[in-house]
Amino acid sequence: MMLNSDTMELDLPPTHSETESGFSDCGGGPGPDGAGSGDPGVVQVRSSELGESGRKDLQHLSREERRRRRRATAKYRTAHATRERIRVEAFNLAFAELRKLLPTLPPDKKLSKIEILRLAICYISYLNHVLDV
Protein backbone atom coordinates (compact mmCIF):
# COMPACT_ATOMS: atom_id res chain seq x y z
CA MET A 1 0.00 0.00 0.00
CA MET A 2 1.31 3.41 -0.96
CA LEU A 3 0.80 6.38 1.33
CA ASN A 4 0.12 9.74 -0.20
CA SER A 5 0.74 12.73 2.03
CA ASP A 6 -1.76 14.79 0.02
CA THR A 7 -4.71 12.56 0.87
CA MET A 8 -3.72 11.39 4.33
CA GLU A 9 -5.46 13.13 7.22
CA LEU A 10 -4.51 12.65 10.82
CA ASP A 11 -7.20 12.91 13.47
CA LEU A 12 -5.03 14.25 16.27
CA PRO A 13 -6.23 16.36 19.18
CA PRO A 14 -4.92 19.91 19.11
CA THR A 15 -1.88 20.56 21.26
CA HIS A 16 -1.93 22.90 24.24
CA SER A 17 -0.18 25.60 22.26
CA GLU A 18 -2.72 25.41 19.44
CA THR A 19 -5.81 25.61 21.66
CA GLU A 20 -4.81 28.30 24.12
CA SER A 21 -3.37 31.69 23.47
CA GLY A 22 -0.90 33.36 25.76
CA PHE A 23 -3.70 35.73 26.73
CA SER A 24 -6.23 33.15 27.92
CA ASP A 25 -6.60 35.02 31.21
CA CYS A 26 -7.78 38.13 29.34
CA GLY A 27 -11.35 36.96 28.91
CA GLY A 28 -11.03 33.86 26.71
CA GLY A 29 -13.43 33.22 23.81
CA PRO A 30 -14.55 36.16 21.73
CA GLY A 31 -12.33 39.10 21.00
CA PRO A 32 -12.89 42.68 22.08
CA ASP A 33 -15.54 43.28 19.43
CA GLY A 34 -17.56 40.22 20.54
CA ALA A 35 -16.71 38.05 17.52
CA GLY A 36 -14.21 35.24 17.87
CA SER A 37 -11.68 34.46 15.19
CA GLY A 38 -11.87 31.07 13.52
CA ASP A 39 -8.09 30.97 13.00
CA PRO A 40 -6.29 29.27 15.92
CA GLY A 41 -3.09 31.08 14.93
CA VAL A 42 -4.56 34.52 15.65
CA VAL A 43 -4.09 35.88 19.15
CA GLN A 44 -6.94 38.04 20.40
CA VAL A 45 -6.18 40.76 22.94
CA ARG A 46 -8.26 43.59 24.36
CA SER A 47 -7.24 46.83 22.73
CA SER A 48 -7.00 48.48 26.15
CA GLU A 49 -4.18 46.11 27.14
CA LEU A 50 -1.81 46.92 24.30
CA GLY A 51 -0.77 50.21 22.79
CA GLU A 52 -1.02 50.83 19.06
CA SER A 53 2.53 49.59 18.43
CA GLY A 54 1.99 46.54 20.67
CA ARG A 55 -1.04 45.46 18.65
CA LYS A 56 0.80 45.81 15.35
CA ASP A 57 3.81 43.88 16.66
CA LEU A 58 1.67 41.02 17.94
CA GLN A 59 -0.30 40.70 14.70
CA HIS A 60 2.83 40.29 12.59
CA LEU A 61 4.44 37.60 14.74
CA SER A 62 4.46 34.06 13.51
CA ARG A 63 2.78 31.34 15.55
CA GLU A 64 6.22 30.07 16.59
CA GLU A 65 7.33 33.51 17.79
CA ARG A 66 4.14 33.97 19.83
CA ARG A 67 4.77 30.54 21.35
CA ARG A 68 8.36 31.51 22.25
CA ARG A 69 7.20 34.73 23.89
CA ARG A 70 4.51 32.91 25.87
CA ARG A 71 7.06 30.34 27.07
CA ALA A 72 9.39 33.12 28.19
CA THR A 73 7.00 34.33 30.88
CA ALA A 74 7.79 33.64 34.53
CA LYS A 75 4.34 32.09 35.03
CA TYR A 76 4.92 29.58 32.22
CA ARG A 77 8.45 28.71 33.41
CA THR A 78 7.25 28.16 36.99
CA ALA A 79 4.41 25.91 35.85
CA HIS A 80 6.75 23.95 33.59
CA ALA A 81 9.32 23.51 36.38
CA THR A 82 6.59 22.23 38.70
CA ARG A 83 5.36 19.71 36.13
CA GLU A 84 8.92 18.54 35.48
CA ARG A 85 9.65 18.17 39.21
CA ILE A 86 6.52 16.01 39.66
CA ARG A 87 7.50 13.88 36.65
CA VAL A 88 11.06 13.33 37.93
CA GLU A 89 9.82 12.46 41.43
CA ALA A 90 7.41 9.86 40.00
CA PHE A 91 10.22 8.46 37.84
CA ASN A 92 12.57 8.18 40.83
CA LEU A 93 9.84 6.59 42.97
CA ALA A 94 9.27 3.93 40.30
CA PHE A 95 13.00 3.15 40.23
CA ALA A 96 13.05 2.89 44.04
CA GLU A 97 10.14 0.43 43.97
CA LEU A 98 11.84 -1.65 41.28
CA ARG A 99 15.08 -1.58 43.28
CA LYS A 100 13.31 -3.05 46.34
CA LEU A 101 12.29 -6.09 44.29
CA LEU A 102 15.82 -6.96 43.14
CA PRO A 103 17.90 -9.35 45.22
CA THR A 104 21.43 -7.96 45.67
CA LEU A 105 24.28 -8.43 48.10
CA PRO A 106 24.46 -6.35 50.17
CA PRO A 107 20.72 -5.59 50.07
CA ASP A 108 21.19 -1.89 50.82
CA LYS A 109 23.79 -1.34 48.08
CA LYS A 110 23.22 1.90 46.16
CA LEU A 111 22.62 1.22 42.46
CA SER A 112 22.43 3.59 39.54
CA LYS A 113 19.33 3.62 37.36
CA ILE A 114 21.06 1.75 34.56
CA GLU A 115 22.28 -0.88 37.05
CA ILE A 116 18.72 -1.27 38.36
CA LEU A 117 17.41 -1.78 34.82
CA ARG A 118 20.14 -4.28 33.89
CA LEU A 119 19.69 -6.25 37.12
CA ALA A 120 15.91 -6.28 36.56
CA ILE A 121 16.42 -7.68 33.07
CA CYS A 122 18.75 -10.39 34.38
CA TYR A 123 16.42 -11.24 37.26
CA ILE A 124 13.35 -11.49 35.00
CA SER A 125 15.32 -13.70 32.60
CA TYR A 126 16.38 -15.90 35.51
CA LEU A 127 12.78 -16.21 36.75
CA ASN A 128 11.62 -17.12 33.23
CA HIS A 129 14.32 -19.79 33.07
CA VAL A 130 13.22 -21.20 36.44
CA LEU A 131 9.61 -21.39 35.24
CA ASP A 132 10.60 -23.12 31.99
CA VAL A 133 12.55 -25.90 33.73
Swiss-Prot record:
<comment type="subunit">
    <text>Efficient DNA binding requires dimerization with another bHLH protein.</text>
</comment>
<dbReference type="GO" id="GO:0005634">
    <property type="term" value="C:nucleus"/>
</dbReference>
<dbReference type="GO" id="GO:0001228">
    <property type="term" value="F:DNA-binding transcription activator activity, RNA polymerase II-specific"/>
</dbReference>
<feature type="domain" description="bHLH">
    <location>
        <begin position="75"/>
        <end position="127"/>
    </location>
</feature>
<dbReference type="GO" id="GO:0030154">
    <property type="term" value="P:cell differentiation"/>
</dbReference>
<comment type="function">
    <text>May serve as DNA-binding protein and may be involved in the control of cell-type determination, possibly within the developing nervous system.</text>
</comment>
<keyword id="KW-0539">Nucleus</keyword>
<feature type="compositionally biased region" description="Basic and acidic residues">
    <location>
        <begin position="52"/>
        <end position="65"/>
    </location>
</feature>
<dbReference type="InterPro" id="IPR036638">
    <property type="entry name" value="HLH_DNA-bd_sf"/>
</dbReference>
<keyword id="KW-0238">DNA-binding</keyword>
<feature type="region of interest" description="Disordered">
    <location>
        <begin position="1"/>
        <end position="78"/>
    </location>
</feature>
<feature type="compositionally biased region" description="Basic residues">
    <location>
        <begin position="66"/>
        <end position="78"/>
    </location>
</feature>
<dbReference type="GO" id="GO:0000977">
    <property type="term" value="F:RNA polymerase II transcription regulatory region sequence-specific DNA binding"/>
</dbReference>
<keyword id="KW-0221">Differentiation</keyword>
<dbReference type="GO" id="GO:0046983">
    <property type="term" value="F:protein dimerization activity"/>
</dbReference>
<dbReference type="Pfam" id="PF00010">
    <property type="entry name" value="HLH"/>
</dbReference>
<keyword id="KW-0217">Developmental protein</keyword>
<dbReference type="InterPro" id="IPR011598">
    <property type="entry name" value="bHLH_dom"/>
</dbReference>
<keyword id="KW-0805">Transcription regulation</keyword>
<dbReference type="InterPro" id="IPR040238">
    <property type="entry name" value="TAL-like"/>
</dbReference>
<feature type="compositionally biased region" description="Gly residues">
    <location>
        <begin position="25"/>
        <end position="39"/>
    </location>
</feature>
<protein>
    <recommendedName>
        <fullName>Helix-loop-helix protein 1</fullName>
    </recommendedName>
</protein>
<keyword id="KW-0804">Transcription</keyword>
